[in-house]
């Protein structure tokens, strides 16, 4: 079986636009690999493809759960592999598109063979998080395994899970080995020169705030309180707290745009680090990635 193409790039780089163009040209079906577009109602702040775009190119793994639910990497991997198998069974070509490192790694490397959850230990770690803060817990991880600290991407839920396993077993989730992946993948990664990517992030942030992001954040707050501990998964999405503050009148839109842009730039740097260190791929320019994908989809790679 030929490898499944996988397209990744940092946030705001334009991977969805490239996927749509290729999807229309080659009749592809997109398998989304994003931790927050899985949630119904998180549309503007996640830059989710619009209904019109999805009518042109079928997308899978969008709008699959309510914002009140948790959605983890194991659940994603099972759903994504099922969607890929379905697309292939119908004689079509799936294209995995996304920037969530944990999801991409789970597809490419396989799911970690991690012990089941320990509710009592998790509660202890969550209490630690509330009392000491995320930086203290990340420092504990880094002292034992610096690479693991980078891999966790400052995600509180992942940090809690990592320490839950580590304090019980002396090993982190990624140290238990992996279940073999269901498919082989051919990775295509791209980025822009950093000043250009920064400008794209800033412009997109302002556009999303003007398009109704504050109202979307206010709706989310009605569904899931943002101040719960541990922090709800949906409120880990970039920018929603700032957008909510704009709606509440406690933060002006320009200040919110600056804060969101800064956080998004930091996230983009982590994404690029992940691609290089965890996926072992060096990003190329957008045009180089597009040319390579066209060559692959035209038959060179699909016949491998």
UniProtKB/Swiss-Prot annotation:
Enzyme class (EC, first level): transferase
Superkingdom of origin: Bacteria
Keyword Signal: no
Pfam families given in the database record: IPPT (PF01715)
Catalytic activity reported: adenosine(37) in tRNA + dimethylallyl diphosphate = N(6)-dimethylallyladenosine(37) in tRNA + diphosphate
GO biological process: tRNA modification
Keywords noted in UniProt: ATP-binding, Magnesium, Nucleotide-binding, Transferase, tRNA processing
EC number: 2.5.1.75
Cited InterPro entries: Dimethylallyltransferase, IPT, P-loop_NTPase
Residues annotated as binding ATP: 9-16
Residues that coordinate or bind substrate: 11-16
Ranges in a coiled coil: none
Gene3D superfamilies listed in its UniProt record: 1.10.20.140, P-loop containing nucleotide triphosphate hydrolases
HAMAP family recorded: IPP_trans
Protein family per UniProt: Belongs to the IPP transferase family.
Protein's recorded name: tRNA dimethylallyltransferase
């Amino acid at each position: 079986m030929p490898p499944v193409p996988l397209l990744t790039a940092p946030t705001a780089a334009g991977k969805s636009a490239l996927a749509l163009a290729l999807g229309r040209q080659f009749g592809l079906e997109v398998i989304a690999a994003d931790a927050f577009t899985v949630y119904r109602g998180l549309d503007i702040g996640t830059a989710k493809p619009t209904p019109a775009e999805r009518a042109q190119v079928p997308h899978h793994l969008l709008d699959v759960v309510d914002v009140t639910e948790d959605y983890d990497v194991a659940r994603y991997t099972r759903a994504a592999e099922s969607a890929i198998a379905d697309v292939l069974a119908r004689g079509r070509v799936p294209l995995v598109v996304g920037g969530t490192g944990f999801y991409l790694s789970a597809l490419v490397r396989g799911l970690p063979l991690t012990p089941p959850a320990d509710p009592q230990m998790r509660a202890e770690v969550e209490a630690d998080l509330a009392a000491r803060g995320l930086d203290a817990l990340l420092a504990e991880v880094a002292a034992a395994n610096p690479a693991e600290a980078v891999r966790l991407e400052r995600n509180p839920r992942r940090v809690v899970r990592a320490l839950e396993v580590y304090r019980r077993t002396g090993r982190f989730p990624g140290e238990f080995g992996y279940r073999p992946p269901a498919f082989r993948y051919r990775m295509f990664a791209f980025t822009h020169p950093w000043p250009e990517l920064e400008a794209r992030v800033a412009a997109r942030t302002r556009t999303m705030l003007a398009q109704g992001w504050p109202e979307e954040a206010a709706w989310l707050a009605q569904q899931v309180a943002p101040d719960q501990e541990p922090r709800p998964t949906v409120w880990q999405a970039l920018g929603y707290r700032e957008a909510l503050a704009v709606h509440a009148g406690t933060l002006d839109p320009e200040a919110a745009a600056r804060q969101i842009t800064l956080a998004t730039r930091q996230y983009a740097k982590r994404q690029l680090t992940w691609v290089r260190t965890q996926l072992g791929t060096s990003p190329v320019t957008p045009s180089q990635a597009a040319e390579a994908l066209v060559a692959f989809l035209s038959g060179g790679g699909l016949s491998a």
